[in-house]
Amino acid sequence: MHHVVSATTNPAKIQAILQAFDEIFGEGSCHIESVAVESGVPEQPFGSEETRAGARNRVANARLARPNADFWVAIEAGIDDDSTFSWVVIESASQRGEARSATLPLPDVILEQVRAGEALGPVMSQYTGIDQIGRKEGAIGVFTGGRLTRSSVYHQAVVLALSPFHNAIYR
């Protein structure tokens, strides 16, 4: 059984990680352990590079916290121009996989508050009345009318980031 360390305690992110690992390696083949670690970037990262750095930093910190795992996984959400997205970083002892998620354009009324220094999650909670929305369906769920959720979009990016770990051509 693979020991997978999730560099987050966010249920939406953990669900995406578990589902993707089950699909790639077989249901029940992985044990997910969650750890809360720092990203080393602002709570609301801006731009692709800052967001990717946050995910890479979380993986590095998870490796320090749980050095005996088989995989370390981080999902860092950010704002790029007028959209929200995330970076997924997965490492094993010898490999790294990275993938960027789909992007969701955000309305100006939300972007104004985020650009003024507030994190997207609290702004969305204020807008929708849904407490801790970032740990649930997220802005993605709200603005797609539930057709997609934060977890479903993250799931796709985790599957993509896992590609080097189960395809021999990457080695």
From Swiss-Prot:
CC cofactor note: Binds 1 divalent metal cation per subunit; can use either Mg(2+) or Mn(2+).
Chain sites annotated for binding substrate: 8-13
Catalytic activity: XTP + H2O = XDP + phosphate + H(+); ITP + H2O = IDP + phosphate + H(+)
Domain of life: Bacteria
Pfam families: NTPase_I-T
GO process annotations (BP): nucleotide metabolic process; thiamine metabolic process
Binding site for Mg(2+): 38
Chain ranges passing through the membrane: none
InterPro entries reported for this sequence: ITPase-like_fam, Non_canon_purine_NTPase, NTPase/PRRC1, YjjX_NTPase
Assigned EC number: 3.6.1.73
Disulfide topology: none
Enzyme type, top EC level: hydrolase
Molecular-function GO terms, alphabetical: ITPase activity; metal ion binding; nucleotide binding; ribonucleoside triphosphate phosphatase activity
The keyword Nucleotide-binding belongs to this UniProt entry's keyword annotation: yes
Required co-factors: Mg(2+); Mn(2+)
Assigned keywords, A-Z: Hydrolase, Magnesium, Manganese, Metal-binding, Nucleotide metabolism, Nucleotide-binding
Subunit text: Homodimer.
Its biological purpose: Phosphatase that hydrolyzes non-canonical purine nucleotides such as XTP and ITP to their respective diphosphate derivatives. Probably excludes non-canonical purines from DNA/RNA precursor pool, thus preventing their incorporation into DNA/RNA and avoiding chromosomal lesions.
Family per similarity comment: Belongs to the YjjX NTPase family.
Protein name as catalogued: Inosine/xanthosine triphosphatase
UniProt organism field: Klebsiella pneumoniae subsp. pneumoniae (strain ATCC 700721 / MGH 78578)
